[in-house]
Protein backbone atom coordinates (compact mmCIF):
# COMPACT_ATOMS: atom_id res chain seq x y z
CA UNK A 1 0.00 0.00 0.00
CA UNK A 2 1.27 3.45 -0.90
CA UNK A 3 2.11 5.55 2.11
CA UNK A 4 0.26 8.84 2.31
CA UNK A 5 2.47 11.71 3.35
CA UNK A 6 1.08 13.71 6.22
CA UNK A 7 0.73 17.42 5.50
CA UNK A 8 3.45 19.56 7.03
CA UNK A 9 2.23 21.18 10.22
CA UNK A 10 2.45 24.97 10.38
CA UNK A 11 5.11 26.40 12.65
CA UNK A 12 3.71 27.55 15.99
CA UNK A 13 4.32 31.04 17.32
CA UNK A 14 6.63 29.69 20.02
CA UNK A 15 8.60 27.69 17.45
CA UNK A 16 8.98 30.81 15.32
CA UNK A 17 10.19 32.71 18.38
CA UNK A 18 12.74 29.99 19.24
CA UNK A 19 14.04 30.12 15.67
CA UNK A 20 14.36 33.90 15.92
CA UNK A 21 16.26 33.59 19.21
CA UNK A 22 18.71 31.18 17.59
CA UNK A 23 19.44 33.76 14.87
CA UNK A 24 19.86 36.75 17.21
CA UNK A 25 23.71 36.52 17.42
CA UNK A 26 23.95 36.71 13.63
CA UNK A 27 21.37 39.42 13.00
CA UNK A 28 21.65 41.83 15.94
CA UNK A 29 24.26 43.79 17.85
CA UNK A 30 21.85 44.20 20.75
CA UNK A 31 18.54 42.73 21.90
CA UNK A 32 16.74 43.37 25.17
CA UNK A 33 13.34 41.94 26.05
CA UNK A 34 11.34 43.03 29.09
CA UNK A 35 7.97 41.73 30.20
CA UNK A 36 5.97 44.68 31.50
CA UNK A 37 3.40 44.43 34.29
CA UNK A 38 0.75 45.79 31.93
CA UNK A 39 0.62 46.16 28.14
CA UNK A 40 1.68 49.45 26.58
CA UNK A 41 -0.21 50.71 23.55
CA UNK A 42 2.50 53.25 22.79
CA UNK A 43 6.26 53.74 22.83
CA UNK A 44 8.59 56.57 21.84
CA UNK A 45 12.28 57.17 22.44
CA UNK A 46 13.07 60.40 24.27
CA UNK A 47 15.98 62.60 23.14
CA UNK A 48 18.74 61.96 25.67
CA UNK A 49 22.22 63.42 26.11
CA UNK A 50 24.96 61.24 24.63
CA UNK A 51 27.21 61.21 27.71
CA UNK A 52 28.51 57.75 28.65
CA UNK A 53 29.21 56.97 32.30
CA UNK A 54 31.43 54.30 33.77
CA UNK A 55 29.74 51.49 35.72
CA UNK A 56 31.86 48.61 37.03
CA UNK A 57 34.58 49.44 34.53
CA UNK A 58 32.19 49.53 31.58
CA UNK A 59 31.15 52.60 29.61
CA UNK A 60 27.35 52.77 29.51
CA UNK A 61 25.05 55.21 27.75
CA UNK A 62 21.59 55.77 29.23
CA UNK A 63 18.67 56.19 26.84
CA UNK A 64 15.07 56.88 27.89
CA UNK A 65 11.68 56.17 26.37
CA UNK A 66 7.97 56.77 26.94
CA UNK A 67 5.51 53.96 27.60
CA UNK A 68 2.01 53.79 29.07
CA UNK A 69 -0.25 51.26 30.75
CA UNK A 70 -3.47 49.49 29.86
CA UNK A 71 -4.69 48.07 33.16
CA UNK A 72 -7.86 46.48 34.47
CA UNK A 73 -10.65 48.67 35.85
CA UNK A 74 -9.39 48.33 39.42
CA UNK A 75 -5.74 49.22 38.80
CA UNK A 76 -4.36 52.75 38.29
CA UNK A 77 -2.85 53.74 34.95
CA UNK A 78 0.43 55.58 34.49
CA UNK A 79 2.51 57.39 31.93
CA UNK A 80 6.00 55.98 32.50
CA UNK A 81 9.53 56.97 31.58
CA UNK A 82 11.78 53.94 31.20
CA UNK A 83 15.57 53.90 30.93
CA UNK A 84 18.09 51.42 29.63
CA UNK A 85 21.89 51.50 30.01
CA UNK A 86 23.53 50.48 26.75
CA UNK A 87 27.13 49.35 26.25
CA UNK A 88 29.22 51.90 24.39
CA UNK A 89 29.85 49.52 21.48
CA UNK A 90 26.09 49.29 20.89
CA UNK A 91 25.70 53.06 20.60
CA UNK A 92 28.70 53.54 18.31
CA UNK A 93 29.14 52.72 14.63
CA UNK A 94 32.12 50.45 15.27
CA UNK A 95 32.17 47.17 13.33
CA UNK A 96 30.29 44.29 14.89
CA UNK A 97 32.21 41.76 16.94
CA UNK A 98 32.43 38.25 15.55
CA UNK A 99 29.42 35.96 15.83
CA UNK A 100 31.29 33.65 18.23
CA UNK A 101 32.17 36.57 20.48
CA UNK A 102 28.62 37.86 20.35
CA UNK A 103 27.28 34.48 21.47
CA UNK A 104 29.56 34.68 24.51
CA UNK A 105 28.61 38.30 25.23
CA UNK A 106 24.91 38.10 24.50
CA UNK A 107 23.85 37.42 28.08
CA UNK A 108 25.63 40.60 29.16
CA UNK A 109 23.72 42.56 26.55
CA UNK A 110 20.30 41.57 27.81
CA UNK A 111 19.97 44.81 29.76
CA UNK A 112 16.58 45.26 31.37
CA UNK A 113 14.78 48.56 31.39
CA UNK A 114 14.16 50.48 34.59
CA UNK A 115 11.16 52.70 35.30
CA UNK A 116 12.73 55.99 36.41
CA UNK A 117 9.58 58.14 36.53
CA UNK A 118 5.84 57.65 36.40
CA UNK A 119 2.84 59.98 36.31
CA UNK A 120 -0.69 59.12 37.37
CA UNK A 121 -2.97 58.93 34.34
CA UNK A 122 -6.75 58.84 33.98
CA UNK A 123 -7.63 55.67 32.04
CA UNK A 124 -5.28 53.89 29.64
CA UNK A 125 -2.56 55.73 27.72
CA UNK A 126 -3.40 55.18 24.06
CA UNK A 127 -0.63 57.47 22.78
CA UNK A 128 2.25 59.45 24.29
CA UNK A 129 4.41 61.99 22.45
CA UNK A 130 7.05 64.51 23.53
CA UNK A 131 7.19 68.04 22.12
CA UNK A 132 10.20 68.25 19.74
CA UNK A 133 11.00 71.86 20.69
CA UNK A 134 10.76 71.12 24.44
CA UNK A 135 11.13 67.37 25.12
CA UNK A 136 10.23 67.73 28.80
CA UNK A 137 6.65 68.49 27.72
CA UNK A 138 4.74 65.28 27.02
CA UNK A 139 1.23 64.88 25.62
CA UNK A 140 -0.96 61.81 26.02
CA UNK A 141 -4.34 60.66 24.79
CA UNK A 142 -6.61 58.39 26.83
CA UNK A 143 -9.50 55.99 26.35
CA UNK A 144 -12.06 58.79 26.60
CA UNK A 145 -10.34 60.96 23.98
CA UNK A 146 -8.98 63.44 26.56
CA UNK A 147 -5.57 65.01 25.91
CA UNK A 148 -3.25 65.44 28.92
CA UNK A 149 -0.05 67.48 29.20
CA UNK A 150 2.79 66.50 31.55
CA UNK A 151 5.97 68.37 32.48
CA UNK A 152 9.08 66.34 33.36
CA UNK A 153 10.66 69.42 34.94
CA UNK A 154 8.26 69.11 37.88
CA UNK A 155 10.02 66.71 40.22
CA UNK A 156 7.37 66.07 42.87
CA UNK A 157 6.57 62.41 43.38
CA UNK A 158 3.16 61.27 42.07
CA UNK A 159 2.78 64.51 40.14
CA UNK A 160 0.01 64.34 37.55
CA UNK A 161 -0.91 66.24 34.42
CA UNK A 162 -0.46 70.02 34.35
CA UNK A 163 -3.35 70.44 31.89
CA UNK A 164 -6.11 68.52 30.15
CA UNK A 165 -8.03 69.26 26.97
CA UNK A 166 -11.46 67.81 26.19
CA UNK A 167 -13.20 67.85 22.84
CA UNK A 168 -13.43 64.30 21.54
CA UNK A 169 -16.33 62.08 22.59
CA UNK A 170 -14.56 58.75 22.11
CA UNK A 171 -11.25 56.93 22.35
CA UNK A 172 -8.43 57.99 20.03
CA UNK A 173 -5.04 56.87 18.72
CA UNK A 174 -3.91 59.87 16.68
CA UNK A 175 -1.55 62.28 18.47
CA UNK A 176 1.18 64.39 16.86
CA UNK A 177 3.21 67.47 17.75
CA UNK A 178 4.06 69.84 14.91
CA UNK A 179 7.80 69.35 14.19
CA UNK A 180 8.22 72.96 13.03
CA UNK A 181 5.79 75.00 15.18
CA UNK A 182 6.24 74.80 18.94
CA UNK A 183 3.18 73.85 20.97
CA UNK A 184 0.89 72.80 18.12
CA UNK A 185 -0.64 69.39 18.85
CA UNK A 186 -3.06 67.32 16.78
CA UNK A 187 -5.39 64.70 18.25
CA UNK A 188 -7.69 62.33 16.37
CA UNK A 189 -10.55 60.23 17.68
CA UNK A 190 -12.88 57.33 17.01
CA UNK A 191 -15.69 59.92 16.90
CA UNK A 192 -14.39 61.01 13.48
CA UNK A 193 -13.00 64.36 14.60
CA UNK A 194 -9.54 65.93 14.57
CA UNK A 195 -8.57 68.76 16.93
CA UNK A 196 -5.67 71.22 16.88
CA UNK A 197 -4.45 72.43 20.29
CA UNK A 198 -2.04 75.11 21.47
CA UNK A 199 -0.47 73.45 24.51
CA UNK A 200 1.53 76.58 25.36
CA UNK A 201 -1.77 78.18 26.41
CA UNK A 202 -3.02 75.80 29.08
CA UNK A 203 -5.61 78.33 30.26
CA UNK A 204 -7.50 77.94 26.99
CA UNK A 205 -9.25 74.57 27.12
CA UNK A 206 -10.82 74.79 23.66
CA UNK A 207 -9.15 73.57 20.47
CA UNK A 208 -7.65 76.19 18.17
CA UNK A 209 -9.33 74.46 15.24
CA UNK A 210 -11.39 71.37 14.57
CA UNK A 211 -11.63 69.30 11.41
CA UNK A 212 -14.80 67.28 10.87
CA UNK A 213 -14.27 65.96 7.34
CA UNK A 214 -14.24 62.23 8.10
CA UNK A 215 -17.39 60.12 8.47
CA UNK A 216 -15.88 57.33 10.58
CA UNK A 217 -13.06 56.57 13.04
CA UNK A 218 -9.88 58.59 12.44
CA UNK A 219 -7.05 56.10 12.88
CA UNK A 220 -4.03 58.38 12.71
CA UNK A 221 -2.82 61.94 12.11
CA UNK A 222 0.66 63.13 11.14
CA UNK A 223 2.24 66.52 10.39
CA UNK A 224 4.15 67.24 7.20
CA UNK A 225 7.87 67.44 7.99
CA UNK A 226 8.54 70.62 5.97
CA UNK A 227 5.33 72.61 5.48
CA UNK A 228 4.19 73.71 8.92
CA UNK A 229 0.50 74.07 8.08
CA UNK A 230 0.00 70.70 6.36
CA UNK A 231 -1.02 67.43 7.99
CA UNK A 232 -2.60 64.16 6.96
CA UNK A 233 -5.26 61.87 8.44
CA UNK A 234 -6.48 58.35 7.65
CA UNK A 235 -9.87 56.94 8.57
CA UNK A 236 -12.12 53.90 8.62
CA UNK A 237 -14.19 55.75 6.01
CA UNK A 238 -11.53 54.55 3.52
CA UNK A 239 -10.03 57.97 2.91
CA UNK A 240 -6.67 59.67 3.30
CA UNK A 241 -7.04 63.43 3.61
CA UNK A 242 -4.44 66.20 3.43
CA UNK A 243 -5.39 69.25 5.51
CA UNK A 244 -4.08 72.80 5.76
CA UNK A 245 -4.52 74.68 9.03
CA UNK A 246 -5.13 77.80 6.94
CA UNK A 247 -8.37 76.24 5.69
CA UNK A 248 -11.26 74.34 7.27
CA UNK A 249 -11.66 72.25 4.13
CA UNK A 250 -9.64 69.26 2.94
CA UNK A 251 -7.13 70.30 0.29
CA UNK A 252 -6.66 66.74 -1.04
CA UNK A 253 -8.73 63.59 -0.57
CA UNK A 254 -7.85 60.04 -1.61
CA UNK A 255 -10.44 57.25 -1.51
CA UNK A 256 -9.09 53.70 -1.18
CA UNK A 257 -10.65 50.24 -1.25
CA UNK A 258 -9.60 49.30 2.30
CA UNK A 259 -8.94 51.56 5.27
CA UNK A 260 -5.51 52.87 6.17
CA UNK A 261 -4.49 52.58 9.83
CA UNK A 262 -1.43 54.79 9.68
CA UNK A 263 0.59 57.22 7.56
CA UNK A 264 4.01 58.88 7.58
CA UNK A 265 5.58 61.81 5.76
CA UNK A 266 9.17 61.50 4.57
CA UNK A 267 11.78 63.41 6.56
CA UNK A 268 13.92 63.91 3.43
CA UNK A 269 11.56 64.25 0.45
CA UNK A 270 8.80 66.83 0.90
CA UNK A 271 6.48 65.15 -1.62
CA UNK A 272 6.80 61.56 -0.38
CA UNK A 273 4.08 60.01 1.80
CA UNK A 274 3.56 56.43 2.99
CA UNK A 275 0.28 54.87 4.15
CA UNK A 276 -0.78 51.36 5.15
CA UNK A 277 -3.62 49.51 6.81
CA UNK A 278 -5.97 46.58 6.67
CA UNK A 279 -4.87 45.04 3.35
CA UNK A 280 -1.29 44.53 4.73
CA UNK A 281 0.44 46.44 1.92
CA UNK A 282 2.53 49.60 2.35
CA UNK A 283 1.81 52.29 -0.25
CA UNK A 284 4.01 55.18 -1.37
CA UNK A 285 2.44 58.38 -2.73
CA UNK A 286 3.59 61.61 -4.33
CA UNK A 287 1.67 64.52 -2.79
CA UNK A 288 1.61 66.23 -6.19
CA UNK A 289 -0.22 63.23 -7.72
CA UNK A 290 -2.03 61.66 -4.78
CA UNK A 291 -4.71 59.72 -6.66
CA UNK A 292 -2.38 56.91 -7.76
CA UNK A 293 0.31 55.24 -5.61
CA UNK A 294 3.90 55.38 -6.79
CA UNK A 295 4.47 51.86 -5.52
CA UNK A 296 3.08 49.24 -3.14
CA UNK A 297 5.19 46.92 -1.00
CA UNK A 298 4.10 43.44 0.12
CA UNK A 299 5.64 41.73 3.13
CA UNK A 300 3.20 41.81 6.02
CA UNK A 301 0.60 39.06 6.43
CA UNK A 302 -1.92 41.09 8.44
CA UNK A 303 -2.93 44.70 9.09
CA UNK A 304 -0.16 47.28 9.32
CA UNK A 305 -0.32 49.15 12.64
CA UNK A 306 2.30 51.91 12.37
CA UNK A 307 4.76 53.55 9.98
CA UNK A 308 7.83 55.73 10.50
CA UNK A 309 10.60 57.05 8.27
CA UNK A 310 14.09 56.76 9.74
CA UNK A 311 15.47 60.01 11.23
CA UNK A 312 18.96 58.96 10.08
CA UNK A 313 18.90 56.90 6.87
CA UNK A 314 17.45 58.40 3.72
CA UNK A 315 15.08 56.00 1.98
CA UNK A 316 14.50 53.80 5.03
CA UNK A 317 10.86 53.25 6.01
CA UNK A 318 9.76 50.98 8.86
CA UNK A 319 6.36 49.35 9.40
CA UNK A 320 4.84 47.14 12.09
CA UNK A 321 1.86 44.84 11.91
CA UNK A 322 -0.68 42.62 13.57
CA UNK A 323 1.32 39.75 12.04
CA UNK A 324 3.89 40.26 14.86
CA UNK A 325 6.47 41.58 12.41
CA UNK A 326 8.42 44.81 11.99
CA UNK A 327 9.80 45.40 8.50
CA UNK A 328 12.49 47.84 7.40
CA UNK A 329 12.11 48.86 3.76
CA UNK A 330 14.96 50.24 1.63
CA UNK A 331 13.15 52.40 -0.91
CA UNK A 332 16.31 52.72 -3.00
CA UNK A 333 16.08 49.00 -3.79
CA UNK A 334 12.65 49.27 -5.40
CA UNK A 335 12.89 47.69 -8.84
CA UNK A 336 16.29 46.10 -8.20
CA UNK A 337 17.01 42.83 -9.98
CA UNK A 338 16.81 39.69 -7.86
CA UNK A 339 18.13 36.17 -8.11
CA UNK A 340 15.41 33.47 -7.86
CA UNK A 341 16.68 32.39 -4.43
CA UNK A 342 16.52 35.97 -3.15
CA UNK A 343 12.98 36.47 -4.47
CA UNK A 344 11.80 33.70 -2.14
CA UNK A 345 12.72 35.96 0.82
CA UNK A 346 10.57 38.86 -0.38
CA UNK A 347 10.60 41.90 -2.63
CA UNK A 348 14.01 43.58 -3.18
CA UNK A 349 13.09 46.59 -1.04
CA UNK A 350 12.41 44.37 2.02
CA UNK A 351 15.63 45.19 3.87
CA UNK A 352 15.07 43.42 7.20
CA UNK A 353 12.26 41.70 9.08
CA UNK A 354 12.26 41.72 12.88
CA UNK A 355 10.45 38.59 14.05
CA UNK A 356 10.96 38.73 17.80
CA UNK A 357 7.38 39.48 18.87
CA UNK A 358 4.82 36.80 19.74
CA UNK A 359 1.70 38.98 19.54
CA UNK A 360 0.59 41.94 17.37
CA UNK A 361 2.93 44.93 17.50
CA UNK A 362 1.23 48.03 18.90
CA UNK A 363 3.92 50.56 18.05
CA UNK A 364 7.66 51.05 17.52
CA UNK A 365 10.11 53.96 17.53
CA UNK A 366 13.45 54.89 15.96
CA UNK A 367 16.03 56.30 18.38
CA UNK A 368 16.95 59.84 17.30
CA UNK A 369 20.41 59.63 18.89
CA UNK A 370 21.62 56.17 17.86
CA UNK A 371 21.11 55.07 14.24
CA UNK A 372 19.34 51.71 13.86
CA UNK A 373 18.42 51.47 17.56
CA UNK A 374 14.75 50.53 17.84
CA UNK A 375 12.14 49.91 20.52
CA UNK A 376 8.80 48.15 20.05
CA UNK A 377 5.84 47.04 22.17
CA UNK A 378 3.36 44.23 21.60
CA UNK A 379 -0.09 43.33 22.90
CA UNK A 380 1.20 40.71 25.34
CA UNK A 381 3.06 43.06 27.72
CA UNK A 382 6.49 42.76 26.03
CA UNK A 383 8.86 45.65 25.27
CA UNK A 384 11.86 44.95 23.04
CA UNK A 385 14.89 47.13 22.37
CA UNK A 386 17.01 46.00 19.45
CA UNK A 387 19.68 47.06 17.01
CA UNK A 388 20.47 45.19 13.79
CA UNK A 389 24.07 44.07 13.35
CA UNK A 390 26.42 46.62 11.80
CA UNK A 391 27.55 44.04 9.27
CA UNK A 392 24.08 43.88 7.69
CA UNK A 393 23.02 47.52 7.98
CA UNK A 394 24.62 49.83 5.51
CA UNK A 395 23.15 53.28 4.90
CA UNK A 396 20.96 52.80 1.81
CA UNK A 397 22.50 54.67 -1.10
CA UNK A 398 20.37 55.66 -4.09
CA UNK A 399 21.71 55.10 -7.59
CA UNK A 400 22.89 58.31 -9.22
CA UNK A 401 19.84 58.35 -11.49
CA UNK A 402 17.28 57.27 -8.85
CA UNK A 403 14.00 59.22 -8.79
CA UNK A 404 11.20 58.09 -6.45
CA UNK A 405 8.59 59.72 -8.71
CA UNK A 406 9.41 57.36 -11.61
CA UNK A 407 8.04 54.28 -9.85
CA UNK A 408 4.56 54.50 -11.37
UniProtKB/Swiss-Prot annotation:
Protein known as: Histone acetyltransferase type B subunit 2
Q: Where in the cell is it found?
A: Cytoplasm; Nucleus
Which species does this protein come from?
A: Kluyveromyces lactis (strain ATCC 8585 / CBS 2359 / DSM 70799 / NBRC 1267 / NRRL Y-1140 / WM37)
Please indicate if the UniProt record lists Cell cycle as a keyword.
Answer: no
- The WD repeats lie at 120-160, 167-207, 213-253, 255-295, 299-339, 356-396
> PROSITE patterns from the xrefs?
WD_REPEATS_1, WD_REPEATS_2, WD_REPEATS_REGION
The entry sums up its family as follows:
Belongs to the WD repeat RBAP46/RBAP48/MSI1 family.
Q: Which GO terms describe its biological process?
A: chromatin organization
Q: What does this protein do?
A: Regulatory subunit of the histone acetylase B (HAT-B) complex. The complex acetylates 'Lys-12' of histone H4 which is required for telomeric silencing.
Return the GO cellular component terms, semicolon-separated: cytoplasm; nucleus
Q: Where is this region: Interaction with the histone H4 N-terminus?
A: 341-345
Keyword flag Signal: no
Output the SUPFAM superfamilies linked to this UniProt entry: WD40 repeat-like
Q: How does it assemble?
A: Component of the HAT-B complex composed of at least HAT1 and HAT2. The HAT-B complex binds to histone H4 tail.
Q: Where is this site: Important for interaction with HAT1?
A: 272
**InterPro entries found in the cross-reference section:** G-protein_beta_WD-40_rep (IPR020472), Histone-bd_RBBP4-like_N (IPR022052), WD40/YVTN_repeat-like_dom_sf (IPR015943), WD40_repeat_CS (IPR019775), WD40_repeat_dom_sf (IPR036322), WD40_rpt (IPR001680), WD_repeat_RBAP46/RBAP48/MSI1 (IPR050459)
Print the keywords alphabetically.
Answer: Chromatin regulator, Cytoplasm, Nucleus, Repeat, WD repeat
Amino acid sequence: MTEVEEPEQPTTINEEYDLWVSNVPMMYDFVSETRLTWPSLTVQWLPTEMQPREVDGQQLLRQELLIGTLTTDNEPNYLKIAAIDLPENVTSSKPSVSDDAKENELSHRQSKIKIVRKFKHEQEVTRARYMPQSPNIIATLNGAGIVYIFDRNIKEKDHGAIASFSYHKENGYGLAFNPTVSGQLLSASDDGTVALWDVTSTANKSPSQTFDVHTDIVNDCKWHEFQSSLFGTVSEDNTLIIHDTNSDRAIQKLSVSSAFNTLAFSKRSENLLAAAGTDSNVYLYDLRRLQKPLHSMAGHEDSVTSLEFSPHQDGLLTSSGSDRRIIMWDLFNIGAEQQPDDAYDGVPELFMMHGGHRSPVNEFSHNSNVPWLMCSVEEENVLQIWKPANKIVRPPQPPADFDITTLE
